[in-house]
Amino acid sequence: MGLLRIMMPPKLQLLAVVAFAVAMLFLENQIQKLEESRSKLERAIARHEVREIEQRHTMDGPRQDATLDEEEDMVIIYNRVPKTASTSFTNIAYDLCAKNKYHVLHINTTKNNPVMSLQDQVRFVKNITSWKEMKPGFYHGHVSYLDFAKFGVKKKPIYINVIRDPIERLVSYYYFLRFGDDYRPGLRRRKQGDKKTFDECVAEGGSDCAPEKLWLQIPFFCGHSSECWNVGSRWAMDQAKYNLINEYFLVGVTEELEDFIMLLEAALPRFFRGATELYRTGKKSHLRKTTEKKLPTKQTIAKLQQSDIWKMENEFYEFALEQFQFIRAHAVREKDGDLYILAQNFFYEKIYPKSN
């Protein structure tokens, strides 16, 4: 290349550089188009599969024996918050579904919009409650909490979730947008090419690391009300806390994911039998890590912690952590450094009238 620069006139050198740059832009554009085509094909295949199942259901006609028993009628919704180890956990559900005989379905919303339109809410509720062929079912996706009760359904799904320290989650998401992770390393990310560190972003007051970007876990638990997405809303945080306690079966934390999985296996073995052992000894696909991630400095963390938004998101995180640890304390015991699930700790007596 150095010899060519010596032999080529300056104008030709400039033309060569321009031609190379144009060629690279063209290649990147083609790669992007291929990715978009692949995504469209995946969605088309998924829609076709759904139509086939619905057609079979229609042709079979209404079944008189279609009533499912309690366990077979179960539906779990994991409305996963981005960058909380959600892929690691979901991969376990996929690995167990054939063995434990349930279905796993990804809720793919346009542009990952966590808020559904009213008509899509109706469709979603109808699908989940009446789609017997997909029961028992485990649904997962980046969708905010949806209250099934207001749609008049008799049996609501079981909600679960995992949340993470809000600053750690934001840092992970910041680098994920730029460098991706080891799960799909070849995929081009939206902010790819931006080498600015998280510390530099905060120091410069960048939009990708602004305190407003912390506001995500609260609205995901709050739901589809407009106030949920009003950044810094005290009402939204209170509603998120209410839903966590009253509408979620179990909410774990990323930092204690194994304990979360252990509790699910003990309480819902129909879905999670074998999950703890799989997490401990299974394939590396369960361990998804953002690449090129640099931990923020104490100064950066301190600056973010001055924000009222961080204070609210952190209060919600601490609330969830305390609740999770309370549930765990009443479900397990520690022995020689290992946790053990408690056996049944209640029984019935004084049963009347006496049978003959």
Curated annotation (Swiss-Prot):
The keyword Transcription does not apply. GO terms for biological process: gene expression; heparan sulfate proteoglycan biosynthetic process; heparin proteoglycan metabolic process; ureteric bud formation. Disulfide bonds join 201-209, 222-228. GO terms for cellular component: Golgi membrane; membrane. Pfam families: Sulfotransfer_2. Glycans are attached at residues 108, 127. Its EC number is 2.8.2.-. Residues 1-11 are cytoplasmic. InterPro entries: Heparan_SO4_2-O-STrfase, P-loop_NTPase, Sulfotransferase. Gene3D superfamilies: P-loop containing nucleotide triphosphate hydrolases. Residues 24-51 form a coiled coil. Residues 29-356 are lumenal. The active site is at residues 140, 142. It comes from the Eukaryota. One of its GO terms (molecular function) is heparan sulfate 2-sulfotransferase activity. It is found in: Golgi apparatus membrane. It is a single-pass type II membrane protein. It is an enzyme of class 2 (transferase). Keywords: Coiled coil, Disease variant, Disulfide bond, Glycoprotein, Golgi apparatus, Intellectual disability, Membrane, Signal-anchor, Transferase, Transmembrane, Transmembrane helix. Homotrimer. Interacts with the C5-epimerase GLCE. PANTHER family: HEPARAN SULFATE 2-O-SULFOTRANSFERASE, HEPARAN SULFATE 2-O-SULFOTRANSFERASE 1. Catalyzes the transfer of a sulfo group from 3'-phospho-5'-adenylyl sulfate (PAPS) to the 2-OH position of iduronic acid (IdoA) or glucuronic acid (GlcA) within the heparan sulfate (HS) chain and participates in HS biosynthesis. Required for metanephric development of kidney formation, suggesting that 2-O-sulfation within HS is essential for signaling between ureteric bud and metanephric mesenchyme. Belongs to the sulfotransferase 3 family. This is Heparan sulfate 2-O-sulfotransferase 1. It comes from Homo sapiens (Human).
